[in-house]
Structures are given as structure tokens and as C-alpha cells.
Amino acid sequence: MSLREQMGADTLIAEYTPPDVIQKFMTGGDVGHDKDGSVLRIEPWGYLDMKGIMYSCKKSDLEKSKLLQCEKHLKDLEAQSEKVGKPCTGLTVVFDMENVGSKHMWKPGLDMYLYLVQVLEDNYPEMMKRLFVINAPTLFPVLYKLVKPLLSEDMKNKIFVLGGDYKDTLLEYIDAEELPAYLGGTKSEGDEKCSELICHGGEVPKEFYLENTDDFETMETITVGSGDKIYVEYEIENENTYIKWEYKTEEHDIGFGLFRKNGDEWEEVVPIERTDCSIMTLDGSHKCKDPGTYALCFDNSFSMMTSKNVRYTAEVMDPEVDSEDINKMIKDSTWDELSAQIS
């Protein structure tokens, strides 16, 4: 199952609102269209505080926000195609590296940003049309060496690094009235940087950090010894019950998966994935189609020298009641009967 299906991308526009920290500090914005009608997006990456954002939200929120962005692009392209009377496809990105410094070489942040690019590639393979890099800093060769192994060949072929005359080049592909004034066009929404359309990021205040909430205080804590695994069991009594989880290590990485007991053996349901989750909380859920004994597995078998302290929480949720069942309850039940049915 693709991430797009897992996250219910078809309903994100109607049902999902990103956390405040993503809305206020995740750089970028759509400003119009290029000459072919493709969506034009500006990414002022140099002003992105990826560490602050990763400290302030869950990985699933970053994934959902990227999918939401792509779903909005599809809607935009559909409307633009109808407006101009021809098919409009793809995304043109101006990737502005002004203000990029050593903080942007923080490996977890780079990995996460590139992972989100990979989310776009994997789930919307034809979305990215071209990416113009402008204001490349002196450390660009170092950054490129770091990210090159993580980019697909297809993505590499869509990247164009422009020199000091980038404004002239951009205007070959983008009409002036569609390009923000600070990039050589004439568009001004709020100011020459089109701040009403583009989030220009900035340092994330520490009050946004999840560590400042009480969530971590309510989590269970376990220590997974070096070379060891720990199974945390839950009894699932009904079909189609959901189990949800969140976890985070104090340091280092940990393997995590979901298993179901089959006789005396544990059967893998969600494959174990080894991830460094010391930076941000990882979360997920699974619909248990069959009753039985399920277990969250925290796997440290790959580490023969280091124990891992893990904080986690899990919740077992009753099977979904679909809208047809709800309508039947309301139609055929009194208020007291309805309360009894859903309690």
C-alpha cells in the first residue's frame, strides 16, 4: 500500500489541517503558473529551520502536509487546464538557497527534507517538472555531495543550477506577472516577496517544541538491551479494531514493527523498520482485521553495544462505525438507546 493510500490523501483537502508550526514556518508557497500552465512554487530553503520543525511535530504531519500540498497542486492543475483549454501538468520549483549556512548541513534535517521530496516522487511520479536552484552558496558543492546519493536519477535530470543571471533565465520559463518581484518579475502579493503567498520561514520558537508539552510525561518508558527485542502485547477482541502508537528514543535509533501471535510464533504484520527517532516522535496505526494477540516490537538486535531507552504510548480503538450504521442508529433508536449502542 502506498503512503498516499495509507494517509487517505483523497480526503486530506477536506479533512486535514497541518499543525501551526508547519503552517507558520515550513517554507514555500505557490504563486501562480509558468508559461506552460504548470504550478509555480517558490521554496526559500535558506530560511527553513528544519530542526525546529522536526522538534515540533510528528513525522506523519510532515508526510500528510506534503501529500496535502500535492493534492492541492492536482486540483490547481485541473482548474488551470480548464481555464486555458489545454492539459496543464507538473510543478516548476524555484529553490532559493539565499541564507543557506552550516545549520542546513544538519544530517537529520537534510534526510527528512529529501525524504519528503521522495514522498512526492513515489506518490506523484510525474509531478516534478523542473527545479531551478538559485543563489547557490559557496558550500553548495559540499551539500550536493551529501544529497547526491539520496536523489533518484530522474530527479537529478530535473535540477538546473542557475548563475547570477538567474532572473533572465527564469523569465524565459515564467511570465513576469507570475514571478515575484524579488526574483525578477512584477508580482507583488503583500510585498515584493509575495509574503501573502510564500512562507519565508524563520527560527521556530521553542514553545512549539513537543518536549514542552505534557505528552512525553504520559508515555511509558522501557529500556531495550543491546542485542535484544521487547514485545509489548495487546489483546484485540474484535475484528477491524485499530491500534495506534507513538514512540521516541532518548538517543540513537531503534527498530519498530507490529506482530500478531500465531501459535507459539510471532507473525510480522507491519515490517520492522530501523529509524533514528531521537529527533522527532514517530507514529502510526494499523487496522487489525482479525482478533488475537498483537504486539509492538522494539528491536535493538542490531546493536551489540548500546541499550536504548524508548518512550511510547499505544491506544486500542474500537472498530469504526460507518455512516450507514450511524444513520440506522439515529433512525431506529431513541437517544438513550443510541448512547447505549456507542458507549
Swiss-Prot record:
One of its GO terms (biological process) is visual perception. The keyword DNA damage does not apply. The keyword Transcription regulation does not apply. It comes from the Eukaryota. One of its GO terms (cellular component) is cytoplasm. The modification N-acetylserine is found at S2. Outer and inner segments of photoreceptor cells. Residues 206-316 form the GOLD domain. Keywords: Acetylation, Sensory transduction, Transport, Vision. SUPFAM superfamilies: CRAL/TRIO domain, Supernatant protein factor (SPF), C-terminal domain. InterPro entries: CRAL-TRIO_dom, CRAL-TRIO_dom_sf, GOLD_dom, GOLD_dom_sf, SEC14/CRAL-TRIO_domain. Residues 18-191 form the CRAL-TRIO domain. CDD domains: SEC14. Shuttles 11-cis- and all-trans-retinals between rhodopsin and retinochrome and regenerates the photoproducts of both pigments. Also binds weakly to retinol. This is Retinal-binding protein. The lineage of its organism: Eukaryota, Metazoa, Spiralia, Lophotrochozoa, Mollusca.
